[in-house]
From Swiss-Prot:
Pfam families the record matches: PDZ
Subunit structure as annotated in this protein's UniProt entry: Homooligomer. Interacts with FZD5. Interacts with FZD8. Interacts with GRID2 and BECN1. Interacts with CSPG5. Interacts with CLCN3. Interacts with STX6. Interacts with CFTR. Interacts with ASIC3. Interacts with GOLGA3. Interacts with NLGN1. Interacts with RHOQ. Interacts with MARCHF2; the interaction leads to CFTR ubiquitination and degradation. Interacts with ADRB1. May interact with CACNG2. Interacts with CCDC62. (Microbial infection) Interacts with C.rodentium and E.coli (strain Sakai) NleG8.
Membrane topology: Peripheral membrane protein
Illness the protein is tied to: A chromosomal aberration involving GOPC is found in a glioblastoma multiforme sample. An intra-chromosomal deletion del(6)(q21q21) is responsible for the formation of GOPC-ROS1 chimeric protein which has a constitutive receptor tyrosine kinase activity.
Breakpoint for translocation to form GOPC-ROS1 fusion protein (site feature) positions: Q419, G420
PROSITE patterns: PDZ (PS50106)
Tissues showing expression: Ubiquitously expressed.
Name the UniProt record assigns to this protein: Golgi-associated PDZ and coiled-coil motif-containing protein
Coiled coil: 83-200
Domain PDZ: 288-371
Function: Plays a role in intracellular protein trafficking and degradation. May regulate CFTR chloride currents and acid-induced ASIC3 currents by modulating cell surface expression of both channels. May also regulate the intracellular trafficking of the ADR1B receptor. May play a role in autophagy. Together with MARCHF2 mediates the ubiquitination and lysosomal degradation of CFTR. Overexpression results in CFTR intracellular retention and lysosomaldegradation in the lysosomes.
């Protein structure tokens, strides 16, 4: 038994891990340090487990008790990682608030000094004008004469009036400051609620996938217990494996669709109606899309997945106004099987980014569409709160930015829905290397049968 299971879940699946991308730069180094510490713990955990395995079988009680204690240590370490991330997040939040308060205090002190100087200058100008006025009227006036003209009660009334005006202005200023502070807190709380909603949506996706993953693995275990060998066993095993990876594929696509604009509903490719997709487990026919890309343009798409994540190279986002959006032949959820004859089925993520960024001129994509809504009990249900807002995995106002029209580069680390059950997080990378006009040519539907699904999905268990 290894500590690799609970630790990554605590290090990446908790509230701290989910919001580390919006933290201060110091938080990034802290999480890197925590990741190194976690790897060292896993290594030591495995070494101790191997040592316990070398104990004589006659002393199995010692081995069992030792592994129970190691399980407790692993659980404690996972909780410690989670608490450390939470404390780090709170610390960075307090540091940011402290910086803001210091800045506001400095501005307030500076304004106070400036106002005092202005009042002093205004008083000097007032006295100067009064002396000039008396000189023009032929009256000799000094400070004593001016004071003598003012009776006692009038001076007191003037002071009371000034004090009353000061109190009224102070009340108005305090109310304005409180309103400003409350608006600032409201904005921060709304952002925090949006992050929590994203975590809930991601957790529901992960739980949904884990449920189907567990069902598939149970069927495989049952298959191992049956007396079945030869081609029939291999065919059934590959069929179960293909279903598991198909559900993983659909989960990633739902995560990708969660970040798209709600005002632009996702459209399936032409000819992909619900009835035909249901017959093929939601997998459409293989299509070829021809594009023309100028040298100064990017593809205008974002990709995710790869061999290391157990899913094919997927189109996770199509940027509006970019060549991929203008051509209309590519869709979110398409798995890129090949580009210009280069097979991408067994390609890792970075390799796919490199291959796509090197394409110039006329580009031929070989893609297959997978509909996440098909063959599922509640895929068509929108996750909405009481106000009617759908839970979205990504919110534009929470993302730090990133120009979708920039040149091709890999900004991995966006999708973390599957991080709780896979130590390698599915990384959504922006691949912006671009396309021009396109035409779409449907091909044979031979790859859409369930028996052949394992040719589209990697048989990688974790």
């Amino acid at each position: 038994m290894s500590a690799g299971g609970p630790c990554p879940a605590a290090a990446g699946g908790g509230p701290g891990g989910a919001s580390c991308s919006v933290g201060a730069p110091g938080g990034v180094s802290m999480f890197r340090w925590l990741e190194v510490l976690e790897k060292e713990f896993d290594k030591a955990f495995v070494d101790v487990d191997l040592l316990l395995g070398e104990i004589d079988p006659d002393q199995a009680d010692i081995t069992y008790e030792g592994r129970q204690k190691m399980t407790s240590l692993s659980s404690c370490f996972a909780q410690l990682c989670h608490k450390a991330q939470s404390v780090s997040q709170i610390n960075h939040k307090l540091e940011a608030q402290l910086v803001d308060l210091k800045s506001e205090l400095t501005e307030t002190q500076a304004e106070k000094v400036v106002l005092e100087k202005e009042v002093h200058d205004q008083l000097l100008q007032l006295h100067s004008i009064q002396l000039q006025l008396h000189a023009k009227t032929g009256q000799s006036a000094d400070s004593g004469t001016i004071k003598a003209k003012l009776s006692g009660p009038s001076v007191e009334e003037l002071e009371r009036e000034l004090e009353a005006n000061k109190k009224e202005k102070m009340k108005e200023a305090q109310l304005e400051a409180e309103v400003k502070l409350l608006r600032k807190e409201n904005e921060a709380l709304r952002r925090h609620i949006a992050v929590l909603q994203a975590e809930v949506y991601g957790a529901r996706l992960a739980a949904k996938y884990l449920d189907k993953e567990l069902a598939g693995r149970v069927q495989q275990i049952q298959l191992l217990g049956r007396d079945m060998k030869g081609p029939a066993h291999d065919k059934l095993w590959n069929q179960l494996e293909a279903e598991i990876h198909l559900h993983r594929h659909k989960t990633v696509i739902r995560a990708c669709r969660g970040r798209n604009d709600l005002k632009r509903p996702m459209q399936a490719p032409p000819g992909h109606d619900q009835d035909s997709l249901k017959k093929s487990q939601g997998v459409g026919p293989i299509r070829k899309v021809l594009l023309l890309k100028e040298d100064h343009e990017g593809l205008g798409i974002s990709i995710t997945g790869g061999k290391e994540h157990g899913v094919p190279i997927l189109i996770s986002e199509i940027h509006p106004g970019q060549p991929a959006d203008r051509c209309g032949g590519l869709h979110v959820g398409d798995a890129i099987l090949a580009v210009n004859g280069v097979n991408l089925r067994d390609t890792k993520h970075k390799e796919a980014v490199t291959i796509l960024s090197q394409q110039r001129g006329e580009i031929e994509f070989e893609v297959v569409y997978v509909a996440p809504e098909v063959d599922s009990d509640d895929e068509n249900v929108e996750y909405e709160d009481e106000s009617g807002h759908r839970y979205r995995l990504y919110l534009d106002e929470l993302e730090g930015g990133g120009n979708p029209g920039a040149s091709c580069k890999d900004t991995s680390g966006e999708i973390k829905v599957l991080q709780g059950f896979n130590k390698k997080a599915v990384t959504d990378t922006h691949e912006n290397g671009d396309l021009g006009t396109a035409s779409e040519t449907p091909l044979d539907d031979g790859a859409s049968k369930l028996d052949d699904l394992h040719t589209l999905y990697h048989k990688k268990s974790y």
